Amino acid sequence: MTVLWFVSLILLISILLVAVKHSKRRWVRQPPSPPGLPIIGNLHQLGELPHQSLCKLSKKYGPVMLLKLGRVPTVIVSTPETAKQVLKDYDLHCCSRPSLEGTRKLSYNYLDIAFSRFDDYWKELRKLCVEELFCNKRINSIQPIKEAEMEKLIDSIAESASQKTLVNLSDTFLSLNVNVICKAVFGVNFQGTVLNNDKFQDLVHEALEMLGSFSASDFFPYVGWIVDWFTGLHARRERSVRDLDAFYEQMIDLHLQKNREESEDDFVDLLLRLEKEEAVLGYGKLTRNHIKAILMNILLGGINTSAITMTWAMAELIRNPRVMKKVQSEIRAQIGKNNKTRIISLDEINHLSYLNMVIKETCRLHPVAPLLVPREVISEFKINGYTIQPKTRLHVNVWAIGRDPEIWKDPEEFLPERFMDCDIDVKGQDYELLPFGSGRRICPAVYMGITTVEFGLANLLYHFDWKLPEGVAVEDIYMDEASGLTSHKKHDLLLVPVKSLV
């Protein structure tokens, strides 16, 4: 009888403890949330462009907003103050990444920099990339490659100018970055790969779509895969991964075959050397799949993001002739008389203050990753008095911050002068402008990305005047965004180059 009473007491205490635990959960003060639907929660409210839909919702529900996306609790922050709390004050509490099917596949089960969880492997890998790939020495070493590719591009555009034909700047900027990245990172010319230009661009676009496409598996972990099979997303994803893997293998084979005395070490050489030396990163040795995952980050991040920003910048400039004239006048006054073979250097670009303002304004209106890459909460913390619990996904709506009338006067207008006599920069310390993120998960290639955009724009604005195709007015320019992980211009930018006579 005594034993029975003792067991009953233990069970009663256990039940009470569970009840108290659940009671505490119920009374946790959570952020306000729009009403959702059964099963899908708030998924139907995201729309085609989630950052815009979430911006509208935040005006009603506040700067810290909780959504139930399928089975996944997701918090959206939409002001500089709340972004600072997430990215600085409580950075360590929410600097991991969620498990998403697209990123898992393309990153070889999270062996990369951008999408892997926060652990010792990620710390050491990021340190390696910052020190070896994105350091000033590496950036300076690829400048001759940039200049050589820019010379080819200027010659090509000059030919179009002489024939008065259109130039697709969306494709032009992407091709420029492809050629530079392939030479600087992989050590080969783009033409040395199995893919031609069009096929390669299709490969990059498809991979980015796979990263940004809606996957039911990401919101319904146990049954979502069935939906992905029926919609064909699973097959597309597998095909994209297979095509990218073939490209990585080709790059690696080329490095293993080439004469080391005739070529300078690039990043692939560095990774292959570490693999050969059985370098240890966090929880294990560097393997071939680690190398491919890192190459994925470089390929998709390095090529596409800068091209997107340059395209948006030129689109805004052609819509704002006053700004176009002003930035070209600055460049030409600083550099001097035009010359067919003249390429503007990085040192000269450092003196182009108005161009820098144009790029900041472009990043404000058109951040490449409008919701940044999602974070996952590791440990509980509070924002504005609201409790954010572990396993919650977290987005910073930098698109909403960039268009907040409480922060920016005339936020929908393209006004680079707003940055005159203003210390706000894009390097992650100013929470009003966060195109590259901030904190531990800030893009490690911020400087490389900025200099790439500056270099491309400065040279094309220096050598050419630009005008709209015949019969097209400024108001006819489509500025619609395409949906996905990155926010690129939905319609290609087609302009007519005119050789500058200045």
From Swiss-Prot:
EC class (word): oxidoreductase
Q: What PROSITE patterns does UniProt report for this protein, alphabetically? A: CYTOCHROME_P450 (PS00086)
Q: Where does heme bind?
A: 443
Q: What is its EC number?
A: 1.14.-.-
Native species: Arabidopsis thaliana (Mouse-ear cress)
Q: Which Gene3D superfamilies match?
A: Cytochrome P450
Q: Which GO molecular function terms does the record list?
A: heme binding; iron ion binding; monooxygenase activity; oxidoreductase activity, acting on paired donors, with incorporation or reduction of molecular oxygen
Q: Which residue spans traverse the membrane?
A: 1-21
**Cellular component per GO?**
membrane
Q: Which cofactor does it need?
A: heme
Pfam families to which the protein is assigned, alphabetical = p450
Q: Which family does it belong to?
A: Belongs to the cytochrome P450 family.
What's the protein called, per UniProt?
Cytochrome P450 71B10
Does the keyword field hold Transmembrane?
Answer: yes
The domain of life is: Eukaryota
Q: How does it sit in the membrane?
A: Single-pass membrane protein
Q: Gene behind this chain?
A: CYP71B10
- Record key words, sorted: Heme, Iron, Membrane, Metal-binding, Monooxygenase, Oxidoreductase, Transmembrane, Transmembrane helix
Task: Read off the SUPFAM superfamilies from this record.
Answer: Cytochrome P450 (SSF48264)
Does Repeat show up as a keyword for this record? no
**CDD domains referenced in this protein's UniProt entry, alphabetically:** CYP71-like
Which compartment or compartments is the protein found in? Membrane
